[in-house]
């Protein structure tokens, strides 16, 4: 199958918020764009403008003022396959400019996803795009590859879903994988709400993108939340200005750390779940007592929602409080963690030992979509 050395596999990490795509062996994705499909809210009146019935990614983002934006992936699960096909089509033909029928394709997914989801992914790759071979890998496992470890617990938090995956000597421990449907998009929504309470109105799908930008540029995680609140009350040291697209300037203060605090206190937005620190701890406690020490010493952060300044220190502090007192805790936050899932995929797909792992088109034709459960962990 992969005899021709010139055939570079494609690596496509379909996130809830961003698609990261590129070629195996590269050190960073070539294409990174929002997982958005936009459709016009109004009818076109200018003839010859070349208006389309749908826009994908950055183009949808730039025309967001006149479009209704939809995300085909929610909480890591694809809920609109027609839009998802549009995104993949855009990825291959417009962004990477490749013919998908000429390259093996490595896709990623969140753990504990419905089986039907990966079957449908497999079906579309082989039937719509005629891929010669494909594979579906678990996101967190790829992040561990990227960090150069074979043992550790990965906390992967993106836009739609967070999960903790303990891995020992390269084996994921499925019984200890925990999934938390609390991630970046919920934080954006929380910030929209906080800002609305302050009298700034953000309601449309386009305005949500502005709030996401505010979150990414200005939010941080407090080491001590209560103390930070006190500081914010008495001094203006935490205040920052942000200029909206129309030139209006808004000032944001305690919102900067109140928004991402939700990761540690989901009850702030009415969720009953444990925070990311407890989830990580619970995941470790579900593992064999003999390997916990290795997991505590290798807590690897990955995904865009782990990009908040202060997250590693706070994580370290919270886990230290939960763990046995003599335990050595180490939280690893690689600088490239925003793309570490993709980077891990790039490493995996270019390993010579991986080449027999691909699901070939012939195997798919023989067994159908369910082959994905036999061939991919």
From Swiss-Prot:
Tissues expressing this chain: Preferentially expressed in mature pollen, pollen tubes, young embryo sac, and organ primordia. Little or no reproductive-gene expression is detected in vegetative organs, such as root, stems, leaves, sepals and petals.
- Which cellular component, as a GO term, is one annotated location? plasmodesma
- Under Enzyme Commission nomenclature, its number is 3.6.4.-
Under the heading InterPro entries, the entry gives: Actin, Actin/actin-like_CS, Actin_CS, ATPase_NBD
GO annotation terms (biological process)? developmental growth; root hair elongation
From the record, give the cysteines joined by S-S bonds. none
What reaction does this catalyse? ATP + H2O = ADP + phosphate + H(+)
Tell where it localizes: Cytoplasm, Cytoskeleton
Q: What PROSITE patterns does its record include?
A: ACTINS_1, ACTINS_2, ACTINS_ACT_LIKE
Say which domain of life the source belongs to.
Answer: Eukaryota
Q: Which residues, renumbered to this chain, carry the PTM N-acetylalanine?
A: 2
List, alphabetically, the Pfam families matched: Actin (PF00022)
A GO molecular function term, named singly, is: structural constituent of cytoskeleton
- Keyword set for this entry? Acetylation, ATP-binding, Cytoplasm, Cytoskeleton, Hydrolase, Nucleotide-binding
Additional facts recorded: There are 8 actin genes in A.thaliana.
Q: Which PANTHER family match?
A: ACTIN (PTHR11937)
Q: Which family does it belong to?
A: Belongs to the actin family.
Summary of subunit composition and partner proteins: Polymerization of globular actin (G-actin) leads to a structural filament (F-actin) in the form of a two-stranded helix. The binding of profilin to monomeric G-actin cause the sequestration of actin into profilactin complexes, and prevents the polymerization.
Relate the protein's function as given in its record. Answer: Actins are highly conserved proteins that are involved in various types of cell motility and are ubiquitously expressed in all eukaryotic cells. Essential component of cell cytoskeleton; plays an important role in cytoplasmic streaming, cell shape determination, cell division, organelle movement and extension growth. This is considered as one of the reproductive actins.
* Name listed for the protein in its UniProt record: Actin-1
Q: Please report the organism this UniProt entry assigns to the protein.
A: Arabidopsis thaliana (Mouse-ear cress)
Query: What gene name is given for the protein in this entry?
Result: ACT1
